[in-house]
């Protein structure tokens, strides 16, 4: 059966940890008939949290995809859902999911409001221009305040909130919502897991508030819709429900507004209305219309329209290792269709790959399908060479889509196999795990020869080591966590490197003149500009020179830390018709970079974390003093509805190892903290080198 893309939705559910993402997804699966029993996070039965570590810890670690159908307005909508982690250590899962999704449901706790990871997820959605709706969850909890959370979304996230519902009751008395558009009350039946609800007239005590927010709603959408504006000023009664719904959808897709609704997923209230809102307001693939890419042959921009008649194109956004089927590549199809058993082109590698099997995923279960079409999300096996961010396409119509960018790891750990006989098994495990997770990096320390694994936080690496033991049967000894510093250039230098070697017979010769300078602010990697003229360096050697410079950036001139932002202008050079070859120019580039970098007054960069502490007022002084002693900079202090203090600060990661234990001591166990990576900043002198020689 062919897709009707008008009725397809590709959405993600994202939020801070413990806001109720997985609980919400489990309710969606129940109400749409995928599951016949509600899975719960707290008892380890959630379908989407299928990893043993997720079930044991009660948190989501990896993004999980599924598919369901929902009847809305007499049409069956197909909804592809990706449930994402809320812990900052696993933000890579959110990043790569949002890259391929058309819409997002952002969950907020009605008690805790906008939390640190809420802000991170919001920035990621802004980066990829993902339309979203907000769902204020946990309306049944003590301290729930729907309107306060809406204000936080406005002030902290800069969102133009459009309130579509008013809660009926609060905390233990939360019963349902008033739909502002239809001016009806929706009350859920608690006896049958919320599968049925009643439509009633609005309670009299909420009529005035409903009219107030309905006027605000119409005024807001009229700012972006001239038809609504005209009716609003001439005769507001002419504005129909369909007019309002259509206008809200248009403004949501244009990122002008964020519709806000509310409920309690755990108490089975509000989820069906959220599914209606997904169908009503979030875009279908044809609402997005097209995706732009680059033709690798012509290097010109090309467009793929989102329909099955276009040439096939897709983006691989996740690689996973499955014990039964092997390497599994998740991908979003933007155009055309793919049949199992056919060949496609990997634009990065230039290789043709045969797709042996295609699956629709339901958490960790694979449902085989023969064909997958534009607008769908699926997975496939058969790839010999596949990486996250690869574009897959019809070999006759090559295209490269924008890749997925990931944050750099900030924490490292030295490991070795517990038993020498396991060294090969450890290497295999590390290779497969780093293939899955672009923020998990494996390297050998050039000073000590140790294997260093790097990731986004202590929990991230803890999960990696746990998976090595469970899935690959490898036990390791580990050192203490260490900060992943970086090096940076501060000055420009023009440098000439001549590599010459004579050993009798054919020798080696390469001559390059280049300018090395700091990269543009906010950029990553190497910006390479070739200005060589007149064939002084044969053009076939230029790619090798660029590749060698990139390789050289992995080892900075001070202590061997990576330089991740530089600009190189290749100015001139010379070659020998007999002695010059690709290797000669690669060696000249690597040696030249190292020699030039030493003269740019390089500095050390350290990772800075955004720290947020929630504490009783009486412990605030001790905690602020301790943060100051850790080279922290206080960014602000707030008070929440329970009169607890929220301390926000920027603190170097090197000062935060073991901070949870320290905080517990300072507050007698009453304070809690969260942290997330902020940015790399110059480390002030003196720089103490730990575990370096």
UniProtKB/Swiss-Prot annotation:
UniProt cross-references to Gene3D superfamilies, sorted A to Z: 3.30.230.10, 3.30.70.240, Elongation Factor G (Translational Gtpase), domain 3 (3.30.70.870), P-loop containing nucleotide triphosphate hydrolases (3.40.50.300), Translation factors (2.40.30.10)
Keywords, alphabetical: Cytoplasm, Elongation factor, GTP-binding, Nucleotide-binding, Protein biosynthesis
Binding site for GTP: 15-22, 83-87, 137-140
Subcellular location field: Cytoplasm
InterPro entries, alphabetized: EFG_II, EFG_III, EFG_III/V, EFG_IV, EFG_V, EFG_V-like, EFTu-like_2, G_TR_CS
Keyword field contains GTP-binding: yes
Role: Catalyzes the GTP-dependent ribosomal translocation step during translation elongation. During this step, the ribosome changes from the pre-translocational (PRE) to the post-translocational (POST) state as the newly formed A-site-bound peptidyl-tRNA and P-site-bound deacylated tRNA move to the P and E sites, respectively. Catalyzes the coordinated movement of the two tRNA molecules, the mRNA and conformational changes in the ribosome.
Name this protein carries in UniProt: Elongation factor G
Species whose genome carries this gene: Karelsulcia muelleri (strain GWSS)
Lineage: Bacteria, Pseudomonadati, Bacteroidota, Flavobacteriia, Flavobacteriales
């Amino acid at each position: 059966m062919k897709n009707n893309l008008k009725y397809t939705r590709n959405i993600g559910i994202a939020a801070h940890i413990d806001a109720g993402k997985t609980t919400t997804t489990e309710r969606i699966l129940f109400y749409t008939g995928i599951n016949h029993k509600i899975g719960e996070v707290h008892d380890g039965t959630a379908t989407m949290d299928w990893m043993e570590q997720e079930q044991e810890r009660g948190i989501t670690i990896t993004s999980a995809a599924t598919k369901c159908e929902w009847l809305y307005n007499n049409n069956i909508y197909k909804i592809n859902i990706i449930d994402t982690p809320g812990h900052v250590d696993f933000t890579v899962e959110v990043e790569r999911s949002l890259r391929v999704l058309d819409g997002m449901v952002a969950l907020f706790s009605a008690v805790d409001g906008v939390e640190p990871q809420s802000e991170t997820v919001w920035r990621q959605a802004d980066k990829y221009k993902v339309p979203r709706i907000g769902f204020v969850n946990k309306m049944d909890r003590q301290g729930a305040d729907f309107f306060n959370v809406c204000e936080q979304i406005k002030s902290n996230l800069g969102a133009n909130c459009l309130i579509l519902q008013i809660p009926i009751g609060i905390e233990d008395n939360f019963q349902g919502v008033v739909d502002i558009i239809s001016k009806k009350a929706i009350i859920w039946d608690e006896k049958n897991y919320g599968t049925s609800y009643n439509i009633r007239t609005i309670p009299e005590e909420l009529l005035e508030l409903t009219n107030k927010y309905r006027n605000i709603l119409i005024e807001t959408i009229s700012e972006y819709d001239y038809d609504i504006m005209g009716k609003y000023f001439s005769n507001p009664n002419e504005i129909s429900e369909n007019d309002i719904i259509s206008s809200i959808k248009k403004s949501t897709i244009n990122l002008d507004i964020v519709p806000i609704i509310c409920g309690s997923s755990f108490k089975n209230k509000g989820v069906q209305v959220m599914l209606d809102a997904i169908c009503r307001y979030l875009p279908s693939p044809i609402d997005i219309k097209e995706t732009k890419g680059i033709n690798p042959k012509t290097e010109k921009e090309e467009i793929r329209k989102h329909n099955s008649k276009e040439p096939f194109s897709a983006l691989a956004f996740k690689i996973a290792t499955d014990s039964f089927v092997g390497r599994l590549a998740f991908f979003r199809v933007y155009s055309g269709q793919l049949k199992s058993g056919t060949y496609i082109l990997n634009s990065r590698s230039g290789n043709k790959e045969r797709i042996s099997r295609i699956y629709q995923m339901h958490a960790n279960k694979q449902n085989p399908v023969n064909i997958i079409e534009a607008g769908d999300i699926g997975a496939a096996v058969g790839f010999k060479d596949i990486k996250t961010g690869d574009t897959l396409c019809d070999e006759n119509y090559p295209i490269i889509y924008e890749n997925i960018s990931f944050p750099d790891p900030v924490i490292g750990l030295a490991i070795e196999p517990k038993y020498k006989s396991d060294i090969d098994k450890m290497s295999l495990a590390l290779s497969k795990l780093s293939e899955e997770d672009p923020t998990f990096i494996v390297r050998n320390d050039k000073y000590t020869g140790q294997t260093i694994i790097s990731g986004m936080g202590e929990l991230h690496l803890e999960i990696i080591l746990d998976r090595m033991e469970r899935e690959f049967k490898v036990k390791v000894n580990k050192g203490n966590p260490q900060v992943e510093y970086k090096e940076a250039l501060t000055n420009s230098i023009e440098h000439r490197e001549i590599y010459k070697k004579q050993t009798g017979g054919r020798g080696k010769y390469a001559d390059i003149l280049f300018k090395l300078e700091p990269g543009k602010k906010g950029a990553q990697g190497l910006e390479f500009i070739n200005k060589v003229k007149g064939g002084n360096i044969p053009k076939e050697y230029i790619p090798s020179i660029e590749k060698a410079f990139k390789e050289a950036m992995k080892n900075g001139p001070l202590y061997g830390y990576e330089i991740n932002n530089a600009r190189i202008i290749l100015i001139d050079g010379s070659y020998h018709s007999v002695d010059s070859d690709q290797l000669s120019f690669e060696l000249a580039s690597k040696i030249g970079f190292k020699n030039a970098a030493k003269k740019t007054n390089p500095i050390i960069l350290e990772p800075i974390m955004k720290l947020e502490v929630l504490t009783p007022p009486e412990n605030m002084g001790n905690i602020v003093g301790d943060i100051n002693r850790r080279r922290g900079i206080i960014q602000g202090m707030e008070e929440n509805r329970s009169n607890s203090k929220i301390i926000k600060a920027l603190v170097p990661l090197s000062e935060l190892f073991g901070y949870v234990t320290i905080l517990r001591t300072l507050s007698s166990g009453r304070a809690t903290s969260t942290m997330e990576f902020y940015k790399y900043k110059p480390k002030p002198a003196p720089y103490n080198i730990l575990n370096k020689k």
